[in-house]
A protein has these predicted regions:
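Short secondary-structure boundary segments
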Residues: 66-67
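Iron-sulfur (Fe-S) cluster-binding modules
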Residues: 1-41, 51, 56-61, 70-139
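S-adenosyl-L-methionine/SAH cofactor-binding core of RNA-modifying enzymes
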Residues: 48
């Protein structure tokens, strides 16, 4: 990891089998590839992998993307006493959880645009330790 990446917030996403989960994962990957955040592995945090738990505890601001109201990302983080600086629950953006279906790429782009706009309007700081609720935006 370069010093530039180390200065970025971490992003964790749901990556389950539903369309909503895969949309959340897609948005996290796009944030990572665009250099907005560095994606890390929520399964490793939930699975108590020491190096990944240390990364989550590094003090970097955390963006959590949950695909549905089960809030698995938030739950995995809270098991380790970690609270995301920004938590996006994608159902609030009109994302529907569908099994055995792919996500809608156009909807994924809209969600990505909304998350990026929120992060640009309300940048995360290095010392941000509490969750700021994500504003509701039109789907």
């Amino acid at each position: 990891m370069t010093d530039t990446r180390a200065a970025l917030p971490l992003v964790y996403s749901c990556s389950g089998c539903s369309s909503a989960a895969q949309l959340a994962n897609h948005v996290a990957l796009r944030l990572d590839r665009a250099g907005v955040a560095e994606m890390s592995c929520i399964a490793g945090v939930g699975g108590d992998v020491p190096s990944l738990v240390r990364t989550a505890h590094s003090g970097r601001p955390i963006i959590a993307l949950d695909g549905c109201p089960l809030n698995c990302v938030q739950g995995c983080l809270s098991r380790h006493g970690i609270q995301a600086a920004r938590h996006y629950q994608l159902q609030q953006y009109g994302v529907k959880k569908r099994r055995h279906e792919d996500f809608d790429p156009a909807q994924a782009q809209l969600v990505l645009d909304q998350v990026q706009a929120d992060l640009a309007a309300h940048p995360l700081t290095a010392h941000e330790a509490t969750a700021a609720p994500a504003p509701r935006m039109a789907a």
